Amino acid sequence: MKTIAFFNNKGGVGKTTFTFHLGYALEQIGKRVLFVDLDPQCNLTAHICSENIIEEAWGEQGNSLYKAIEPIVTGAGDVKTVTPYHVPGRGIWIFIGDLLLSDFEGELSNAWTQILAAQERGFRVTSSLLRMVKEFGESNQIDYILVDLGPNLGSLNRSVILSCDNFIIPMIPDLFSLRGTQNIGRVFG
């Protein structure tokens, strides 16, 4: 199982579109694909799921990614396992994004500080989402986990990039894309 994050510090370069098409192409050649929509704009979720599915996932008893980390955000416990949406008749699943994912940024910032102080909670918090995602992937024989990230270098994106096997930087041939790529190298280099 390979985990690949799609990230650029600049928006509008095709991260979500590339993630979506690569996932469906992999499924066409017989691979089992799990999408993870960690961009709070939730465009990957909107590409794959109907509005009814999204509304249900965001509801009180929903299964969005925010519902998974809500116990951490509220201080009630560790990550809660949620079930991704399975696209009918396809070898494709998606952990549904949520506009509220940005609420997790503050908790992750605190967790980075806890890691520097060698506190276990910091490690549990920063690994929580990808831990749950990878557990689902392993138990369902997923070949590829494709993670769509928003265009920022916040704590959530840093945690995910560091937890993935690879990350791809989609870009367009312009000065701002180049600058964004240089910024990524500065942060992760």
Give the label of every model feature segment.
Residues 1-189:
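P-loop NTP-binding core
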